Regions:
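Helix-start (N-cap) detector for alpha-helical repeat units in TPR-like alpha-solenoids
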Residues: 3-4, 37-38, 71-72, 105-106, ...
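Canonical tetratricopeptide repeat
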Residues: 8, 42, 76, 110, ...
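TPR/TPR-like (Sel1-like) alpha-helical repeat modules
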Residues: 181-208
């Protein structure tokens, strides 16, 4: 019945993802010592994990009322609000937290993701840019900037950001995939094939994705199909991303296709391919005449 005993059990249950059992033990711990804010924070987080968001929001709100600069409480509360699709409320939580940590990468990055889900891409872009300025080693903000610039149809800016991302393992394959798309839009089919081959080598699942997209139709038969080794497909390096990051990537990718400039540029891309082929035919004809 000791505090340490309950806390120890709670930690084990939490690691095993037995959240309801962990919650019981943390609540027993808190009953014995209500001065531990860290335990109350754990209780709030676990309420969120088991789908009792109302209780979670209440607890985290209480903690922030007493201590407005409680960073961990802000991050957990915003995550729960995002999961409930209460994006405007999540934005407010991040904005309040930024008053106390104005140069925090994670706050700007997460705020950018929330603005993305609000379809406020201009503000999302600002937040990702600030995050990228704060920490130049973490590449995912720049990756998102590449996607947003594609959405706006700014191919040069998008290409710049994706080129910066090719050294980062967690977003490398995706960066090459988008570089291949940009090359196709520009009518640079050879460059597109090279980028596509690297993307598929890094992440074999991208082959099927490309095969299903009209933009890659002119080159899909000329890129390398993924090869399976004895141990199966090459490990996808993007596994280091969180579920939230992967969801945002997919969301931006789909948004580009639905409302962005990529679909509009498919026609331009096809025209560029036709022009390139026509130029080749004309050149061949000139050679034959000579």
């Amino acid at each position: 019945n000791s505090i340490q005993g309950h806390k120890y059990l709670a930690t084990i249950y939490e690691k095993e993802e037995k959240y309801e059992l962990a919650l019981e033990e943390y609540e027993k711990t808190y009953e014995l010592n209500q001065e531990e804010k860290g335990i109350y924070l754990k209780i709030g987080k676990l309420y969120g994990n088991i789908g009792r968001e109302k209780e979670a929001i209440q607890i985290l709100g209480e903690l922030l009322k007493k201590k407005p600069d409680y960073y961990e409480a802000s991050m957990i509360l915003a995550d729960i609000l995002n999961s409930k699709k209460e994006f405007k409320e999540a934005v407010q939580v991040y904005m309040n937290a930024l008053k106390y940590r104005p140069a925090d990468y994670d706050l700007y990055y997460n705020l950018g993701m929330t603005y993305t889900l609000l379809n406020d891409f201009a503000k999302a872009k600002e937040c990702y840019e600030k995050a990228a300025q704060i920490n130049s080693v973490l590449y995912h903000a720049r990756y998102s900037l590449g996607q947003i610039n594609l959405l706006y149809g700014d191919l040069e800016e998008a290409e710049k950001y994706f080129m910066e991302c090719i050294e980062a393992e967690e977003v490398e394959s995706g960066a090459y995939y988008y570089l291949a798309r940009i090359a196709m839009i520009k009518g640079e089919t050879e460059k597109a094939k090279n980028y596509a081959n690297i993307a598929i080598e890094e992440n074999p699942t991208l082959y099927d994705k490309m095969a299903d997209e009209n933009i890659f139709m002119p080159i899909i038969d000329e890129v390398n199909k993924p090869r399976l080794s004895v141990d199966g497909k090459k490990k996808n390096k993007r596994k280091t991303l969180s579920k939230k990051e992967m969801f945002i990537d997919l969301y931006l990718d789909n948004t580009c296709k639905i409302v962005g400039k990529l679909n509009n540029n498919d026609i331009e891309m096809m025209e560029n391919v036709k022009k390139t082929k026509q130029q080749t035919i004309n050149l061949d004809n000139e050679i034959e005449k000579e």
